[in-house]
């Protein structure tokens, strides 16, 4: 006589906590499995919502164009295109709009080099 899934779930639903614990232990033993969460899932959710350690150095940065010198607008648009790979219209919009992320996920050294290039072309740049 085979039980249906619904009957099994109904029986489990009616069990007490100690009975559920015994059932889980019996299943572990019978089928040689564990009920432990995978390590990746445990590491993905830090306990208590704790912040990342302060000493951990950030290794990916975003370059944000916060403003520009109007006299050097064309040179800056050209530089934004060269750095980001954007088209002419997108680069122009990014320069004029301000606050746009020009490039993201770059190394510290690359971020410093891009910042230097954009500032030389008249841009005001923030690295986050």
UniProtKB/Swiss-Prot annotation:
Q: What is this protein called?
A: Large ribosomal subunit protein bL12
Q: Which GO terms describe its cellular component?
A: cytosolic large ribosomal subunit
**Lineage of producing organism:** Bacteria, Pseudomonadati, Spirochaetota, Spirochaetia, Brachyspirales
Q: Which UniProt keywords apply?
A: Ribonucleoprotein, Ribosomal protein
InterPro entries under this entry? Ribosomal_bL12, Ribosomal_bL12_C, Ribosomal_bL12_C/ClpS-like, Ribosomal_bL12_oligo, Ribosomal_bL12_oligo_N_sf
A molecular function annotated in GO for this UniProt entry is: mRNA binding
| Assembly and binders | Homodimer. Part of the ribosomal stalk of the 50S ribosomal subunit. Forms a multimeric L10(L12)X complex, where L10 forms an elongated spine to which 2 to 4 L12 dimers bind in a sequential fashion. Binds GTP-bound translation factors.
Which Gene Ontology terms describe the biological processes this protein takes part in?
A: translation
- Signal peptide start-end: none
As for family, the record states:
Belongs to the bacterial ribosomal protein bL12 family.
Q: What does this protein do?
A: Forms part of the ribosomal stalk which helps the ribosome interact with GTP-bound translation factors. Is thus essential for accurate translation.
**PANTHER family given in the database record:** 39S RIBOSOMAL PROTEIN L12, LARGE RIBOSOMAL SUBUNIT PROTEIN BL12M
Pfam families assigned to the protein according to its UniProt record, in alphabetical order = Ribosomal_L12, Ribosomal_L12_N
